[in-house]
Amino acid sequence: MQGKRNVVVLLLDTVRASAMRESGIPVLRSLAKRGTYYSAAVAPGTWTAPSHASLFTNKRVTEIPGVSKDFFGREEIDPWMVKNRFLNGGETTIASRLSRIGYQTTLLSNNPFLTSTTNLGLGFENIYDVWKESNIKYNKGLAEKLSVIINGGQSARHKMYLASYVCTRLLPKGALDWLYMELRNRLNEGVSKAEGRNRLDKGASDANAALRKYLEQRYNYGPQFIFMNYIEAHENYPARVAQDKWLYMSGILDLDERAARALYNGYIKRIRYLDRKISEAITTMKKSGVLDNATLIITSDHGQMFGEHHMLYHSLQPYEGIARVPLIAVNYTNGKIDSESERFDGPVPMNKLHGAISDLASGRTEALDGQLKGARYTVSEHTGISEGWDETLLRMLKPRSKSAARIYEAKHMNNKRVTAVYCGNMKLMHYFGERKDSMYDLDNDPEEEHNVIDVNRALAIKMAAQAK
């Protein structure tokens, strides 16, 4: 093998495995056909922070305190003003491991949870916080308004809540509920516009520009580990329906087929756009020589639900729409694909990607595999919701606002720990005593509608033992 192989990971945030069956994504489908395609990899967590932390450290989500704690009621988890440190400074990450063997490590992230300030970039020599720069560029006015709260920290947020609560005591219950919903809808509309609901691009162009800048100015032609996060597939979407997850999850709005289909169509539009941006990034890396001797990995951190099991989006129970993600590995020599055309449909633990990349970088293997296919059991862990930032306000309002009460209850009910355990085609949903466990035969029941645990008790006991 000619020197150390470059390793490039393009992580397509929020892309579920089944999206690979859609039309209009020629680049992704061609790469899957010509490389090694793991059609049903299993995300270790149900939202960005736990999945990335697990992937970077080769640990299960529940073994990482910074991402498995209860975030319900923690204002610092708000995506617009994240102040959490998800990893402690002593963690050994895949980036730090590769740095020690001579790799130049670079993170380009368009995700607010994956930045230089959250410690998920631990070990990377170069970090480009694309999300921050992209959102300030598009939303200078909003950034200035939010800076008052950001700089004031939690005390500023609590003062704002307290002032709001005192004002609401003067209103009759009916008027308070109307006012809460009116303000919530206006806030959601504002955030939706700020996040680029009507734009297909949510920062992919800026991420690719940052990649070009890095390769032109800092690329040292030594072995490279480049990790990019694209967030185009994340809500909010170009769709003419309400986008507030918790209005649907609480039953205030009906998540009917029309709404679910409109949101899903917007989701697929973004993925089709992202397909073109992936092509652009690959062309950039070919021109710079990064793909002269490299493995390109394309995957996701979690999927997205659109009405299945009456759920919307992610950071929820690890049903298939959330837990299953695509994983594609393609080897390049002299800028051209070494066609392998291998497909693997069994469950693959995404946190084991850490070891597989390490094997690849150290020369122990020449293709991505490592521990990926060898696991008897694979798990995906939901340790609670990520949207807990408004718990204080909801708790204050719920005695006098029926809508706030319903949203609070919906968040509370989904803030329970659930672990999915895979063994071949069988999947166990373990609820830790909150309710009866469920087991599904995914070969015959891919929609997870028929609980077969009562006729598979012996296997269920073995699988439940894997849910720590």
PLM ranges: what are they?
Residues 1-468:
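Catalytic domains that recognize anionic headgroups
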